[in-house]
Structures are given as C-alpha cells and as structure tokens.
A protein has these predicted regions:
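C-terminal amphipathic alpha-helical interaction region
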Residues: 7-17, 24-28, 32-34, 60-131
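Predominant activation on well-ordered alpha-helical scaffold segments within soluble catalytic domains
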Residues: 15, 19-20, 40-44
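N-terminal alpha-helical targeting/anchoring segments
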Residues: 34-36, 40-54, 63-68
Length: 131
C-alpha cells in the first residue's frame, strides 16, 4: 500500500472532476446532470465511510456489548466486525421485542439514537440531528 495518494484523496479528486469539469458539460442535459450529482454524492458517502466507518462500527460494537452483557474484544478485521454487529443487532431487536422495552428504557433508546446519528453522519452529514 502506498502512502499518497490515499483512497480518500483519489475519491475526492474524482468528486472534484465531476463538479468542476463534467457537470458544466451537462448543463443542458438534466438526466446527466442529475446522475453526475448523484455520483458525486455517493463518492462522498464512500469517502466518509472509509475515513470514519470502522471507528463508528467499533463504538456501536462497544455499546451493543454493554447492552447485551457481552464479554468481548474487537475482532481484527472489518468484515468480522460487520458480521458481529449484525448478529448483535438481531439479538438486541429480539431482546427489545421479548422484554417489550420502550422509550422509557433510556439506555436502549440512547444506543439506537446514537447509532442512527452516526449512520446519518456518514450518509448525509448536512442533515441536522440536533433536537
């Protein structure tokens, strides 16, 4: 693996190209303009996921471990973390259903709220999650 350019540097270069060079060429072509903007946005999501995704996944795993009383150490690979978070989210879902937990159970609600906020930070950072 090389030091520079990083994968996020490359993605940001493509985004820059789309906005500064490609999009102006499509000013009279609505569909191509739209697809260019969507592509630019998707690259932004990928870039933010590369930069922050694993850290946010680690936070979610730590919160889930506490809620589900799991004794664990973080798996070494990103794929293993993703699989584990999916399994534990199913366990949490089942626990909430079985125990009929509600919004009054603030530890569970806070976890869900924090997880959603973190996901929105990746997919749509301009969305205001402050209440």
């Amino acid at each position: 693996m090389q030091d520079k350019p990083t994968s996020t540097d490359l993605i940001e270069s493509i985004q820059d190209f789309l906005m500064k060079e490609a999009l102006p060429q499509f000013k009279d072509k609505d569909l191509l303009s739209y697809k260019t903007l969507v592509s630019w946005n998707m690259l932004g999501v990928v870039s933010r996921e590369i930069r922050s995704g694993e850290e946010l996944l680690d936070r979610e795993l730590n919160r889930l471990a506490k809620l589900l009383n799991k004794d664990f150490s973080l798996p070494p690979s990103l794929d293993e973390k993703k699989k584990l978070v999916n399994v534990w989210n199913v366990e949490l879902r089942d626990k909430i259903r079985k125990e009929k937990l509600s919004l009054e159970d603030s530890t569970y609600w806070n976890h869900v709220k924090e997880t959603v906020i973190e996901k929105v930070e990746i997919t749509n950072p301009r969305f205001n999650t402050e209440s």
